[in-house]
Regions:
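Short helix-perturbing small/polar motifs within transmembrane alpha-helices
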Residues: 2-14, 22-28, 35, 75, ...
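Short helix-capping/hinge motifs at transmembrane helix termini and TM-loop junctions
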Residues: 40-45, 65-67, 86-91, 113, ...
């Protein structure tokens, strides 16, 4: 049985933040997302809008590691800064949109709902989809504020943005759905 002092020591250890191992996991996943984003940018080079796979990777990192909201916000800020240096970036828009997306996925991860079909959990896919939508629409809002201020956007332009945002959300949710169980098993083994 644990004494009160041992419980207090355990609580203090838990409040210190992400471990070095967790930070390395976040770094590797965000780097993989950056590579996927560069790769997808070459595939979609003919379009003005491109999907962002960094979102899927920070969603995976946050769902796997369950950081506090502040730590998730830092993960989002770092992801946004990295996105700014990738080809085809819109200055500053990614910083805000990835911050929002990371905080949203962190809050969604804390919700106690479960959605399973024949033993397969769809929570990660749904949470990633919703976080990507929040990030995408925040990016769109930032784009409107930073670049398109005063410009009238046609219905078709908004439809294109919406299609890219929902398409990216679908791709990211599939990536998260497929990789989450594998990564979770690897992390549990260690």
């Amino acid at each position: 049985m644990q004494t009160t002092a041992q419980k207090r020591e355990l609580a203090e250890k838990q409040e210190k933040g992400l471990s070095v191992k967790s930070i390395l996991i976040v770094a590797v996943l965000i780097a993989a997302g950056a590579v996927l984003k560069i790769f997808s940018n070459t595939i979609f080079s003919f379009t003005p809008l491109k999907p962002n796979m960094v979102i899927a990777m920070y969603c995976l990192a946050i769902m796997l590691l369950r950081p506090r909201v502040v730590e998730a916000a830092v993960i989002g800020l770092i992801s946004g800064i990295i996105c700014m240096f990738l080809p085809g970036a819109t200055p500053y828009a990614n910083i805000v949109s990835e911050l929002v997306g990371a905080v949203v996925i962190c809050l969604l991860a804390k919700l106690p709902y479960r959605l399973e079909v024949k033993g397969l959990s769809f929570k990660v896919a749904i949470d990633t989809f919703l976080a990507t939508l929040c990030s995408g629409y925040t990016f769109f809002l930032m784009l409107k504020v930073l670049i398109l201020t005063g410009m009238e956007l046609s219905g078709m332009a908004i439809d294109v943005f919406t299609a890219v945002i929902f398409g990216t959300a679908a791709i990211n949710s599939v990536i998260a759905f497929l990789l989450y169980p594998v990564l979770k098993k690897v992390l549990v083994r260690e």
